Structure formats: structure tokens, C-alpha cells
């Protein structure tokens, strides 16, 4: 089987055997998605590039421990998001004071406006567009900026319980819209 | 010891669990519950799928062309270090030719001195770059602070600027107080320009009369932010538009507008 037709799991297995061609193929297949998510979350080209490299290097180094239990792309993006959140939280700890939080919030909000411009992402775009704005904003701040619920509550000057409920409702609605949950 | 979670309560916590928004103690409780509850594990999977879709729905951007080769070089280098270091250090190697050993030591000293000089120069250069970057960040933060103040003001009016071409993703928002000449412009998805080009904001009066609203550039992602001090209050203007112009700006627009919006009623 040539590289182009290899499954992600077989590429991971070859990476565990230190086959650079497998890494090259895996990178070619997923680099765009990883870089795009990193860029959306970090907002800086250089940082997103470094983070993408870190993620693929981590995959390369720990390929031997990979357990194929679902889509490798989804797993890779979870890894990317976790690393980006670590960075964002480090930034916030460095800048932690009352006056900077609203600025970060302000910086965070434009990203959702540009979300999902490709045709194949239409369903996600529609589902997001249908969410009430306050739910969408809270979900974006939690998901793409890694803000804790307490930080979102402080930024939006909204009670913590309300923020939790908004995020939960947003996810429930998205789940219903995207997965056609029975009874909806 | 805390009582085990009920399924209803666990399901309530699942979204927070996936968003890493739970306290460590609650994370442990949910993890423990999930290890024994098939139903909640299924619920978790469905939420996980939604978040996965969200992660894949971001605007897609090509990574820099050199990233692939950089990654491969780092991976191969890392592998060689791990694999070859033990082999490259023979256990019983002894110096066999003393004059060569002395020569190598001298050469190493010269390299070290040169290296120290280079390192000092490099650190000084880095410090200057960091200082410059810090000043840029401060300027940017001041601008954002003003934008946030404007957003929070009850009398602020947002004006959305769009392209005349429906397929263009370029858009912007102008935050203004109609009775005042100050405003903040935020744009997204405008094509980045060459060094000798710039974007220019036009504030249209009646007919073909217009004021210059200022020039700005956008970053690699097409994002830009500009503070505006117009020659008159915004009630005087009927429309706004942005065009691409030579660096430094033009006395009047020389290209079709990229995005714009009417201001009537402000």
C-alpha cells in the first residue's frame, strides 16, 4: 500500500518505528487542520507555527503509545487545543489583573465572526448561527480561549451560574442540531 | 469520602468536564463515575463529537511552507540524538595523539571566545527587539482599551462594513459615538498588502465630498485595528468606505472600495 492510502493508525505504527516518511505523510494530511486551530486560538502566526510543530513532534515521540480509538484527526485536534489552552492560560497568569481581562475578551470575540467559512462546514456554521449570541460567546470563550467559567463570568459581568447554564445549553443545542438527537 | 455522583448530576458536569472547566476534585468524581457508567460514557462521546466538530470548523489556513521541512529536521535530529549518542561515545576510547588533543583544545577555546562575542551581540540584539515588541504591544493594548471603552458605552453605535461582492469574507465594524469625531475601526479578512500599499478609510459627506479617515494595515490574517479622529462629528457623514491605496494614503480614492457601509441615521 502506498503512503497516500495508508490509514492514520498504520502511519502511527510506522512512526513508532521511526519512519520519517510516515511522519511526513501524517503531517501532510493533518497540518492544515492543526495549524488553523492553533491560529484561531492563539491569534499569532508565529506562535501557531511553533505550536503545530510541537504537536507533531509530540506525536512522533509518543507514537508508540497511541491507542487507535477513534478519528486520529479528532485526537490530534484535542491535543492541539489542550496545548493552546496551556499557552493561553500561561499568558493570562502572566497578565493576570482586572484591567487586562476585558481586553483579552475583546481580542477573543472577533474569532467566532470568521468561523466556518468552508462549504463543508455549513452544518456547524448554521448550528452556531442559530445559538443565542450570549450562549455562543460564552462557549467560544471557554472552547477557543480556554477561559474558566469564573473568568468568563468576571469578563461578562454575569453570574457564574448563568455562564455555566449558557455553555451547557449551547452544547446541548449543538448536539441536537448536529447529531439529530431523538425528540428534537 | 464524597457520595458517588448520580447520572443526572454527572451529565450536568460533562460539558464542563470536556472544557477543562471543573475543579480537580470534581474531575476525579466524574472520571470515577464514567469508569463504571456506560450511559454517561455514551453521553460523553456525543458531547466530545460536538466539540471535535467545533475544532474542525475553524477557518482553514495553510501553515507556512517551511514548517514541514522544519518538523522533519527536528524529528530526525531528535531520533539521531536518542539513537546515536550511546554509539558515538565508545567506552574505552583514549587519546592517542597528544599534540592533536592540544590543538583541539586551543581551537575549542577560540571557538568559545568567538561564541561568547556572538552571544553577547545576540543577547543585546534580542533585548532591543523585545523592547521594540513591548512598545508595540503597549500601543496595541491602549488601542484595545479605547475600543473596549467604546463598546461598553451605552451611546456607542456599531456600524458593520461589508464588501459589495457577496463571496468576499472581508468585513469590519466601526464603533462610533454619533455626536463625536472619535471612533475605532476593526476589520477582518482583508487581503494583506504589499509594503508599498495601505488601506485608507474614507468618510463620505454629500455628493462626492469626503474626508480622509486615516490609513492602516492588516496582519497576516487580515485583522486590523485603527483609532479614528475624524475632522468632524460622525453625524456629518453619510457613508464610510475603505480602499486600497499607495503607502501613505491618497488625496482621494484611486481603487474600488473593499468594504463600506452607509451611515445615515447616525
Regions found by a protein language model. Name each.
Chain A
Residues 2, 16-25, 35-54, 160, ...:
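Short, charged helix-capping/linker segments at alpha-helix termini
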Residues 16-17, 40-45, 54-71, 90-91, ...:
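Sigma70-family region 2
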Residues 4-5, 94-121:
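Internal acidic/polar
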Residues 61-68, 78-99, 117:
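Arg/Lys-rich amphipathic alpha helix in sigma70-family domain 2
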Residues 27-45, 62, 128, 173, ...:
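Amphipathic, Lys/Arg- and hydrophobic-enriched alpha-helical face
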Residues 74, 81, 85, 89, ...:
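DNA-recognition helix of helix-turn-helix
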Residues 13-36, 60, 124, 136:
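A short, charge-rich alpha-helical start-of-domain segment used by transcription regulators
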Residues 50-57, 70-82:
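Structural recognition of an alpha-helix C-terminal capping motif at a helix-to-coil junction
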Amino acid at each position: 500500500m502506498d503512503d497516500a492510502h495508508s490509514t492514520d493508525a498504520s502511519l502511527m505504527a510506522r512512526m513508532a518505528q521511526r519512519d520519517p516518511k510516515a511522519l511526513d505523510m501524517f503531517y501532510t494530511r493533518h497540518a492544515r487542520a492543526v495549524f488553523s486551530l492553533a491560529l484561531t486560538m492563539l491569534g499569532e502566526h508565529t506562535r501557531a507555527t511553533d505550536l503545530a510543530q510541537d504537536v507533531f513532534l509530540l506525536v512522533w515521540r509518543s507514537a508508540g503509545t497511541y491507542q487507535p480509538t477513534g478519528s486520529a484527526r479528532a485526537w490530534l485536534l484535542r491535543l492541539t487545543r489542550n496545548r493552546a489552552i496551556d499557552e493561553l492560560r500561561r499568558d493570562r497568569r502572566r497578565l493576570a489583573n482586572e484591567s487586562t481581562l476585558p481586553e483579552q475578551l475583546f481580542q477573543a470575540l472577533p474569532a467566532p465572526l470568521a468561523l466556518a467559512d468552508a462549504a463543508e462546514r455549513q452544518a456547524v456554521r448554521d448550528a452556531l448561527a442559530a445559538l443565542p449570541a450570549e450562549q455562543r460567546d460564552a462557549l467560544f470563550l471557554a472552547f477557543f480561549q480556554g477561559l474558566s467559567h469564573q473568568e468568563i463570568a468576571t469578563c461578562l459581568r454575569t453570574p457564574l451560574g448563568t455562564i455555566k447554564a449558557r455553555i451547557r445549553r449551547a452544547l446541548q443545542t449543538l448536539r441536537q442540531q448536529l447529531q439529530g438527537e431523538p425528540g428534537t | 469520602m464524597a457520595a458517588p455522583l448520580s447520572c443526572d448530576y454527572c451529565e450536568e458536569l460533562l460539558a464542563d468536564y470536556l472544557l477543562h472547566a471543573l475543579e480537580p476534585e470534581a474531575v476525579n468524581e466524574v472520571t470515577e463515575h464514567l469508569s463504571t457508567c456506560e450511559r454517561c460514557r455514551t453521553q460523553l462521546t456525543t458531547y466530545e463529537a460536538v466539540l471535535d466538530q467545533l475544532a474542525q470548523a475553524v477557518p482553514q489556513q495553510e501553515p507556512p511552507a517551511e514548517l514541514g521541512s522544519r518538523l522533519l529536521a527536528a524529528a530526525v535530529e531528535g531520533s539521531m540524538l536518542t539513537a546515536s549518542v550511546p554509539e558515538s561515545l565508545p567506552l574505552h576510547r583514549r587519546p592517542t595523539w597528544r599534540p592533536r588533543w592540544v590543538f583541539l583544545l586551543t581551537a575549542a577555546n577560540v571557538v568559545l571566545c568567538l561564541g561568547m562575542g556572538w552571544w553577547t551581540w545576540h543577547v543585546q540584539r534580542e533585548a532591543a527587539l523585545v523592547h521594540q515588541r513591548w512598545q508595540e504591544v503597549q500601543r496595541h493594548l491602549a488601542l484595545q482599551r479605547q475600543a473596549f471603552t467604546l463598546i461598553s458605552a451605552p451611546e456607542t453605535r456599531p456600524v458593520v462594513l461589508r464588501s459589495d461582492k457577496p463571496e468576499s469574507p472581508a468585513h469590519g465594524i466601526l464603533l462610533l459615538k454619533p455626536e463625536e469625531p472619535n471612533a475605532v475601526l476593526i476589520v477582518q479578512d482583508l487581503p494583506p498588502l504589499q509594503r508599498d500599499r495601505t488601506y485608507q478609510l474614507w468618510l463620505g459627506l454629500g455628493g462626492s465630498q469626503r474626508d480622509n479617515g486615516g490609513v492602516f494595515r492588516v496582519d497576516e490574517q487580515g485583522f486590523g485595528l485603527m483609532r479614528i479622529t475624524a475632522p468632524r462629528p460622525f453625524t456629518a457623514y453619510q457613508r464610510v468606505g475603505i480602499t486600497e491605496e499607495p503607502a501613505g494614503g491618497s488625496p482621494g480614492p484611486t481603487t474600488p472600495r473593499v468594504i463600506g457601509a452607509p451611515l445615515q441615521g447616525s
